[in-house]
Amino acid sequence: MKFIKKLILSLAFIAGISLGASSAKAACSTHLGDFDWDSANIHTAIATFIIEKGYGCDVEVTKGSTTPIMAAFFDGQIDVITELWEDNLVELLKPHFADGSIIHMGTNTPASEQAFWVDRATAEAHGLKSVEDMKKPGVWELFKDPENPSKGRMTSCISGWTCYTINYVKLKEYGLDELYTNFDP
């Protein structure tokens, strides 16, 4: 009789824990936005794992490019974005940071920056210290575009990404568009 009483109490306890976990899981859910680049995919996968396994919550993930994911984020359809290139969205983010509707929780990769890059050996060999130096006579030939041999090639971002447009505008503003193509890798 003592054994059966313990067994019933144990089963009741396990059932109670199970029901509690199910209720908590149903009450705890979040929607993550994921972008179309690898580091964002990794950060979102890690966050999903922690939220599901560590907190027992349901997680829905929507993948897409910057424009639709950010539109859904601004509309409140997405709760969390684990990685964002703020430089691409400064003006769109400012009012949301100011009114508190979006909270910046920290920086994933503090050393990351968007810029035009040249390897050190080439830069030192040809005295390239700023973007203005890319206009020096003959410099564009160091980066000759095989598809357009009359220009150099600036490898940009994937067409459709915000940074592609930013780089396109920068090439024009810096006066480099006459010398270089904005190459879509």
Regions found by a protein language model. Give the residues of each.
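Short helix-initiation/N-cap motifs at beta->coil->alpha
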Residues: W37-D38, D58-A72, Y180-P185
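Sec/Tat signal peptide C-region and signal peptidase I cleavage site
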Residues: L19-A26
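Ligand-binding cleft/hinge of the Venus flytrap
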Residues: A47-Y55, D133, G138-T181
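Positively charged n-region of N-terminal signal peptides that target proteins for export
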Residues: M1-K6
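Pocket-flanking alpha-helical
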Residues: T44, G64-G100
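A conserved helix-loop-strand patch within extracytoplasmic ligand-binding domains
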Residues: S101-M154
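Short, well-ordered beta-strand elements
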Residues: A26-S39, C57-T62, S150-T155
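Bacterial N-terminal signal peptides
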Residues: I8-S18
